[in-house]
UniProtKB/Swiss-Prot annotation:
It comes from the Bacteria. Both the N-terminus (residues 1-76) and the C-terminus (residues 90-134) have RNA chaperone activity for splicing of td, a bacteriophage T4 pre-mRNA. The lineage of its organism: Bacteria, Pseudomonadati, Pseudomonadota, Gammaproteobacteria, Enterobacterales. Belongs to the histone-like protein H-NS family. Induction: Expressed at low levels at 37 degrees Celsius, barely detectable at 26 degrees Celsius; expression is repressed by hns and partially activated by lrp. It comes from Escherichia coli (strain K12). This is DNA-binding protein StpA. Residues 73-94 are annotated as: Disordered. The keyword Thylakoid does not apply. A DNA-binding protein that acts in a fashion similar to H-NS protein upon overexpression, represses a number of genes including the cryptic blg operon, hns, papB and the proU locus. A subset of H-NS/StpA-regulated genes also require Hha for repression; Hha and Cnu (YdgT) increases the number of genes DNA bound by H-NS/StpA and may also modulate the oligomerization of the H-NS/StpA-complex. Repression can be inhibited by dominant-negative mutants of StpA or H-NS. (Microbial infection) Originally isolated as a suppressor of a splicing defect of the thymidylate synthase (td) gene from bacteriophage T4. Acts as an RNA chaperone, accelerating splicing of viral pre-mRNA. Binds preferentially to unstructured over structured RNA; does not have a detectable high-affinity RNA-binding site in the pre-mRNA. There do not seem to be any specific RNA targets in transcribed E.coli DNA. One of its GO terms (cellular component) is protein-DNA complex. Its main location: cytoplasm. When overexpressed forms homodimers, can interact with the N-terminus (residues 1-64) of H-NS. May interact with Hha and/or Cnu. Disruption phenotype: No visible phenotype in rich medium; double hns-stpA mutants grow slower and have reduced viable cell counts compared to single hns mutants in MC1029 and MC4100 backgrounds. In 0.3M NaCl a double hns-stpA deletion up-regulates 583 and down-regulates 86 genes, 363 of which are thought to have been horizontally acquired; 131 are also up-regulated in a double cnu-hha deletion. It is found in: Cytoplasm, Nucleoid.
Amino acid sequence: MSVMLQSLNNIRTLRAMAREFSIDVLEEMLEKFRVVTKERREEEEQQQRELAERQEKISTWLELMKADGINPEELLGNSSAAAPRAGKKRQPRPAKYKFTDVNGETKTWTGQGRTPKPIAQALAEGKSLDDFLI
């Protein structure tokens, strides 16, 4: 809670602050507080009415669906017939580059992920990636 709200919520602090203002100013502040409080109450009541209307509409639709033999779960796609299938496993990418590692073994690289050290070293020495194309 902010310092201002703590001050407004403490009766002793309010009394001390009220000594600095005239009665007319205090009456004006009181009227403003009443207006703000009334507006806030009306907002809360409006939200409650809207929520009640929404709940009533939902219950009406549920009753209509049950009368027609429709299960609400079917609409959400939770039925076994509408269950999404697991995605197919992706085919591995074909190798795009061929290089020889430090052990003299010939290896391939798809071009994705981290660049192999032998290729990175060759690129640093000025070679082109096209030199390693299969």
